Structures are given as structure tokens and as C-alpha cells.
Design a protein with these regions (language model features):
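N-terminal secretory signal peptides
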Residues: 1-9, 20-23, 27
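C-terminal segment of N-terminal export signals and the immediately downstream linker at the start
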Residues: 29-47, 54, 62, 66
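Active-site glycine-rich loops that stabilize anionic/oxyanionic intermediates
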Residues: 49-52, 117
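Conserved alpha/beta-hydrolase
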Residues: 65-83
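Active-site loop/oxyanion-hole signature of alpha/beta-hydrolase fold enzymes
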Residues: 78-111, 128-129, 155-156
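Conserved hydrolase catalytic core segment
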Residues: 114-146
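Flexible "cap/lid" loop of the alpha/beta hydrolase fold
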Residues: 139-171, 232
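Conserved loop-alpha-helix segment in the C-terminal half of the alpha/beta-hydrolase fold
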Residues: 227-252, 259
């Protein structure tokens, strides 16, 4: 009897040990998967362009969040839901500070910083102040200013004249253009018309101060929307295409890529993150 009892106890112990080992193995696998998933998670800061707001990234942000990423879509002072703050004191530094402060107060690190159109001015300035926090920088059909340039320098002669007249009248902003100016897809015209707001003039009057921080970001990308003609964006794209330290993409789309092709934009952003 004693031998039989011992044999049963031994068998039970083996089974218990095996079960425990199995649970441990599953836990280890689960833990490894969690770590791997966490490693794949990125933090995106998406900066909009002229007359827009964080709202324009809604579709892209939703897609990124569903894939486990953290997303911030700050709206710049005087635009979108912050249009009530429009004033003549808003300049480029104001908008740079808007984004810098999100990064600072949220304690963000290893971020993918994206700037669309006018947002290229903003992220260029942001990189100067938060370079250690940026792991990837993306210019989405965006301006790429050089040190000392101001927005007015890159405007057309007609646009410069219109801004000059607006300043003489004491105006502090310029109305949002119709969606056809940006070649926005017709299905999104109503969305643009409902949300777009005036752009503060002061942001185009202040020269930017750069030391080349954006070039020191580890991963650099330029995305060109070929469905929108703009010599500034085309020149920026061609210059980066010839530079092996940059990745470049083209999308057959109007200027507002995040509105018209959010799925493709998200694919690219995940590739370059």
C-alpha cells in the first residue's frame, strides 16, 4: 500500500509540475508578446496646416489609436476650436510653443512628429527645442524653411499683395480658402467648409530661427501629394529625394492627404515611425 500511495503521489506531483510548467510557459509567451506589442507602440504628434485644426487628422488618428499607438493632434492658437483666441499677437513662436508645450507637459518621448503644409514651419521650430524627444520627423506636403526665412517669402506675389492690403486695413487674419484651392476630394468639401477657420497673418511675418535640428533627427521623411501643384513643396520633395538620409513618398492625392487618404497616410507613418 505504501508503495502504491507513493507512486500515486509521485504521479500527481509530476502532473502538477507539468501543469505549472505549462502555465509558466504560457505566461512567459504572453509576457513576451506584451513586451513586443509595447515596443511596436509609437507616439505620434500630428500638426495641422493653415486654416485647419486637430480635427483634420481625426480619421488618421482613429486608425493609429486602433492599432495601439498614442496620438496627439494639437490645434494651434487662433484656429479650429481655439479660433476664439485669434489676435494680432499670434506669431510663429506662438504656434511652435503650442506644440512644444504638449510634448513637455505630456512628458512625451520617442515621438513621430508630423507637420502638414504650414505645419512644416512649426515642426522645424519644434525640433530646435525638443530634439531629444523626436525619433522621427515627417513633412507631409509641407514647407521646409531655411534659417531666417518667413512665410511671406514663400507666398505668391498675389498673396503677398493681399496680405499687405489686409494689414493696411488692420486685419489680423486671412479667411480660409475654399476646399477646391487644396484639391480636397469632393466628398470632403462639406467637412472642410464646416471646420476651416481664418489663418493668423502674424505667423507669416516672423522669420524662423533654425540651426539644422531637423537634419539631426534619426529618421526623416518627406511625403509629396502629387495631386496638388506647389513649387515650394515640389522643390522640397526633390531635394530630399536626392538625399540618402531622407525617405520620400508620393501619394496621388490633393493637398489634404489626412482627409482624403487617411488609410494610406497611416500606412506610411507606421513604416517610417
Amino acid at each position: 500500500m505504501a508503495e502504491g500511495v507513493n507512486r500515486n503521489l509521485t504521479r500527481r506531483g509530476v502532473l502538477t509540475s507539468a501543469a505549472a510548467t505549462g502555465v509558466g510557459t504560457m505566461a512567459a509567451i504572453s509576457g513576451a508578446a506584451t513586451i513586443a506589442h509595447a515596443a511596436d507602440q509609437k507616439t505620434f504628434v500630428l500638426v495641422h496646416g493653415a486654416s485647419a485644426g486637430g480635427w483634420c487628422y481625426r480619421q488618421a488618428a482613429d486608425l493609429l489609436e486602433k492599432r495601439g499607438h498614442k496620438v496627439f493632434t494639437p490645434t494651434l492658437t487662433g484656429l479650429g476650436e481655439r479660433s476664439h483666441l485669434m489676435s494680432g499677437s499670434i506669431n510663429l513662436d506662438t504656434h511652435i510653443a503650442d506644440v512644444v508645450n504638449v510634448i513637455k507637459w505630456e512628458g512625451l518621448e520617442n515621438i513621430v512628429l508630423v507637420g502638414h503644409s504650414y505645419g512644416g514651419w512649426v515642426i522645424s521650430g519644434v525640433a530646435e527645442q525638443t530634439l531629444p524627444a523626436i525619433s522621427s520627423i515627417v513633412y507631409l506636403d509641407a514647407f521646409m524653411p531655411e534659417d531666417g526665412q518667413k512665410g511671406l517669402d514663400m507666398n505668391s506675389e498675389r498673396s503677398r499683395a493681399e496680405i499687405g492690403e489686409a494689414l493696411k486695413r488692420g486685419e489680423v487674419s486671412r479667411p480660409a480658402p475654399p476646399p477646391t484651392v487644396w484639391n480636397v476630394a469632393e466628398k470632403n468639401h462639406a467637412w472642410w467648409n464646416a471646420k476651416a477657420t481664418a489663418q493668423p497673418i502674424g505667423v507669416a511675418l516672423q522669420p524662423i530661427k533654425l540651426t539644422g535640428a531637423r537634419e539631426r533627427v534619426a529618421k526623416k521623411t518627406y511625403i509629396r501629394a502629387t495631386g496638388y501643384e506647389n513649387p515650394n513643396f515640389e522643390a522640397a520633395y526633390q531635394k530630399r529625394k536626392a538625399d540618402s538620409s531622407w525617405r520620400t513618398y508620393t501619394v496621388l492625392c490633393g493637398h489634404e492627404v489626412m482627409m482624403d487618404m487617411p488609410e494610406r497616410l497611416v500606412e506610411i507613418l507606421q513604416e517610417v515611425a
